[in-house]
Amino acid sequence: MLSYRNLLIWVSFWIFLGLFLFTAGGRLFYPYQLEWMEGETLVYLARLWEGRPFYISPTLEWTPFLYNFLYFYICCALDFFIGDGFIAGRLVSIVSILATVYLLFLIVRDWCGEVIYGVLAAALFLATYVPSGAWMDLARVDSLFIFFITLA
């Protein structure tokens, strides 16, 4: 039997997860930039497809961000199957955040010894989506970075 507190935590988790999936799913196929740096992801993917290097000395044509290239290679692999646009980058970010939520659940559950605390940690992380600027589903390296930091 669930206590009132545990029921409230579970309901909160499912509400926050549903809101995240609803919002991220609605923004996944939006054909334009949701944020000013999202367009740079497409520029990086174009450079990958053309076989041009990322990390060169800054010029007027190209000044690279100091981001790890792994995200762009993953997006490029997805881009091969999905097609051009923001979908591949946003999909990588959404999957990364969902994997982070699952990792948070596992870490806190194992550390505290109770499932409900893992659910609470996952719910609190999902609750930060809007207050943190709704960046978790953008075609940017940040979500994959958060996943790898949590995994470490």
PLM feature spans:
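Extracytosolic helix-loop segments that constitute the early lumenal/periplasmic catalytic or substrate-binding loops
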Residues: 22, 39-63, 70
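Short acidic/glycine- and proline-prone juxtamembrane loop motifs at membrane-interface regions
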Residues: 134-142
